[in-house]
Amino acid sequence: MPPSAGLATESLPAATCPAKKDAYAAAASPESETKLAAGDERAPLVRTTRISTTTIKLYRLTIFVRIAIFVLFFKWRITYAARAISSTDAGGIGMSKAATFWTASIAGELWFAFMWVLDQLPKTMPVRRAVDVTALNDDTLLPAMDVFVTTADPDKEPPLATANTVLSILAAGYPAGKVTCYVSDDAGAEVTRGAVVEAARFAALWVPFCRKHGVEPRNPEAYFNGGEGGGGGGKARVVARGSYKGRAWPELVRDRRRVRREYEEMRLRIDALQAADARRRRCGAADDHAGVVQVLIDSAGSAPQLGVADGSKLIDLASVDVRLPALVYVCREKRRGRAHHRKAGAMNALLRASAVLSNAPFILNLDCDHYVNNSQALRAGICFMIERRGGGAEDAGDVAFVQFPQRFDGVDPGDRYANHNRVFFDCTELGLDGLQGPIYVGTGCLFRRVALYGVDPPRWRSPGGGVAADPAKFGESAPFLASVRAEQSHSRDDGDAIAEASALVSCAYEDGTAWGRDVGWVYGTVTEDVATGFCMHRRGWRSAYYAAAPDAFRGTAPINLADRLHQVLRWAAGSLEIFFSRNNALLAGGRRRLHPLQRAAYLNTTVYPFTSLFLMAYCLFPAIPLIAGGGGWNAAPTPTYVAFLAALMVTLAAVAVLETRWSGIALGEWWRNEQFWMVSATSAYLAAVAQVALKVATGKEISFKLTSKHLASSATPVAGKDRQYAELYAVRWTALMAPTAAALAVNVASMAAAGGGGRWWWWDAPSAAAAAAAALPVAFNVWVVVHLYPFALGLMGRRSKAVRPILFLFAVVAYLAVRFLCLLLQFHTA
């Protein structure tokens, strides 16, 4: 590939490196960005827009008020501990048991408060970014970019989805001569390689068609089959209305019909590859195969290459640039008995192979099911990496990566299991953008290559310092070491370069080096993304968050309850692995380079599964005495306790409302996130704690289940919602569901038992204290059941519409049964 317009990334002049090195690098403020562009005739590429100052001030005030209430509450709890224990003992529980119960409850409440503070404080300084991609219309200003696409199992990640992702990348609105797409096939599956080859052939027609008519999105599956209300989320809107850019409407209709016919034929060929060999004819096996590096499309030149006017290409391509970005298939070597480090190992292999083939200064990371939905997404990401100065471009310096939010097709309209996760992306990540930047979350992320090499940002380097290509750190490959020292991209697709790339993806290359520790993606955890981003922030790098409109990238998400819980289990286990590693946010270095609130955010990200231990106890233990008829809740709550409880609930609601106001998420999305948090905490988080405890005790590695991917548009709305969302209604029992099912059953039975024993009739209580003592336990049961309602829907499958009457009937039957047992006991004891 051609040089990146003189864009230097590995070393900067001493004048650009501030001398001050006594603090972390916080995100640029609106004022600083304005000063950054002073003297430039053009507007800055990135602007920071302020979120409503009044809303943010109220949000911060409410958070600190709630923290103050926490402090007063715990002071009161500890001061009056003896009185609480004595009161409980008077209700029928022994002194030692009461003390144990009180201590456990205080520990749980302290943990919940601590986690809430860790979650809220990093979100108190949110900023919102806007980019001006039109300022980069001059293609000579754009640097080269490598795009990494990873797939690991053709059974769970359809090769057709990988092919569509590749096609969307090749058709993106970025100079063809400056993009190289690398596809990592970690299973060595012949069907995956065949699908990528088919995509390379079809790209010769698809990419010029997209350029000619300016269609969006440039994923053919979503474009042709993702109509309004379909699995593609209505993203094929350009065909019917909107931003049509072609010469004439009839010409678009004719060309579209021809291109669609070719796409359907390609799709049939890929399906035939899968049907022809159910065992996925592989180059060996998934964990034992040779390395392969194959250039499928050579790098394009810098000069436009116009198509022909005749029908040899099915459509008229006169005056259309038909050049294609380079496409490389990579299958790293894997041997039994050697650690391959899952996705992190595959990404590091791509990082080395791409260095000797293209060496672009920037790298975009996409999962195989995440396609480019907005053709300007690549340019938008580059806006954060470079600055316009005069008539050229300079490196933006300390931005290590740009994280785009994950958006999904094919999710049920109600988003029962919070797949969109808007609270995390549009609230937490947006809030972190005002500190050192968002957390890296695995896909839809644009990296600076030099940051992946473990290099400090410019402000923390010595004047004139660059990258020290140490063989003990990077390995012994001379071409790769030369690429590390290089300041510009290059294009090498000759035999020697391919042979060198093949050697760089061998399983033995990393032996005795710093790969996976100080270089590249971090090993030792199944959530290598969080650990890798943390290492960059710890060195002083910043990151940026950008939510494009339309969405930059879109993917698929598991809408089946079992698949979703296994996905959450993998994330939770990976977070705990980071906590027990050298990358522990509490103990790791970088004190001056890492913002304290950024450290708090990473600590929250790695310890949240421990919440399950306390939450499960709260869901079960208070309800069991009610079922047994004991007096664990007989002690009447004091007015002070009720006042604290009311204050905490009111401030929690106020924080939620203000949070939705400044982040733009809906209250319904916030509530669904709360519900699924409860479901996850009583199931997947518990399993993650058990798995990691076993790993810490025995050293046994954690095995995880790869999340199944699917084409969102494979079931069209014509087939009806039952078929379109068939996975949502499929009931697949897994052991992860057992604790949550137990918590749900215990709390429903507790409600029935309380009613059967007459504890619901608080209006008949002799005093207000007695009424509160009767009402609070049942209110807590209702709180648990309401949070677990999506889980109950998942257990009902296609009968989920009847879950309300079924739960009601279950409660009535349980009430009558308990009431009957109470009468029998009274009769026999009379």
Curated annotation (Swiss-Prot):
Predominant subcellular localization, coarse grouping: Golgi
Keyword Transferase listed: yes
UniProt cross-references to Pfam families, sorted A to Z: Cellulose_synt
Locations listed in the record: Golgi apparatus membrane
Residues where substrate binds: 367, 369
GO cellular component entries: Golgi membrane; plasma membrane
Gene3D superfamilies: Spore Coat Polysaccharide Biosynthesis Protein SpsA, Chain A
UniProt KW keywords: Cell wall biogenesis/degradation, Coiled coil, Glycosyltransferase, Golgi apparatus, Membrane, Transferase, Transmembrane, Transmembrane helix
GO MF: cellulose synthase (UDP-forming) activity
Chain coiled-coil ranges: 251-279
Active site residues per record: 186, 529
Record keyword DNA-binding present: no
Protein's membrane topology: Multi-pass membrane protein
Any Gene Ontology biological process: cell wall organization
E.C. number: 2.4.1.-
Tissue expression summary: Expressed in mature pollen.
Stretches that traverse the bilayer: 61-81, 98-118, 613-633, 638-658, 676-696, 735-755, 776-796, 805-825
Sequence similarity: Belongs to the glycosyltransferase 2 family. Plant cellulose synthase-like F subfamily.
Its job: May catalyze both beta-1,3 and beta-1,4 glycosidic linkage on beta-D-glucan. Essential for (1,3;1,4)-beta-D-glucans synthesis in grasses and cereals (Poaceae). The mixed-linked glucans (which are not present in walls of dicotyledons or most other monocotyledonous plants) are particularly important constituents of the walls of the starchy endosperm and aleurone cells of cereal grains such as oats, wheat, rice and barley. They can account for up to 70% by weight of the wall.
PANTHER family: X-BOX TRANSCRIPTION FACTOR-RELATED
The name this protein goes by in its record: Probable mixed-linked glucan synthase 7
